[in-house]
Amino acid sequence: MKIQLVAVGTKMPKWVEEGYKEYSRRFPKDMPLELVEITAGKRGKNADIARILQKEGEAMLAAVPKGNRIVTLDIPGKRWDTEQLAEQLEAWKLDARDVSILIGGPEGLAPACKAAADQSWSLSPLTLPHPLVRVVMAESLYRAWSITANHPYHRE
């Protein structure tokens, strides 16, 4: 199973790139973590945010391979602790589909992305900076994998 993070935003700070790479490289070959960056729409004083969200959503969904399970990151989504995320990872493996996790931009996700989702996950009730979410996602998914693989990374 491949896990794909589809995230709005490019040109992240170096610490984000390094943090993401640190965890993504740890994944086993049979469960690679891939990042697909979607160019954010231009935001300005008179920007049409609905139109920007629509365009970003279209680009995100176009980046998802046909047949993938789509999981959106959204504050009203289901909250999973680390063990529950590990259980989700196991369930996703049994589903025999690759997984695409959609991370929206500053205004969140387009309605089309939410409508296409098989699941919605709330990473936190807090509003987190989107660059930080990439690093947190990579670490959280790696930790969940380590639980399923009985790897010593996760300690209770």
Curated annotation (Swiss-Prot):
UniProt subcellular location: Cytoplasm
UniProt xrefs under Gene3D superfamilies: 3.40.1280.10
Enzyme Commission number(s) from the entry: 2.1.1.177
Key word Kinase present: no
GO cellular component, as recorded: cytoplasm
Stretches assigned to coiled coil: none
Positions of S-adenosyl-L-methionine binding: L73, G104, L123, S124, P125, L126, T127, L128
MF term (GO), any: rRNA (pseudouridine-N3-)-methyltransferase activity
Presence of the UniProt keyword Cytoplasm in the record: yes
Quaternary state and interactors: Homodimer.
Role of this protein: Specifically methylates the pseudouridine at position 1915 (m3Psi1915) in 23S rRNA.
Family: Belongs to the RNA methyltransferase RlmH family.
Record protein name field: Ribosomal RNA large subunit methyltransferase H
Organism, scientific name: Aliivibrio fischeri (strain ATCC 700601 / ES114)
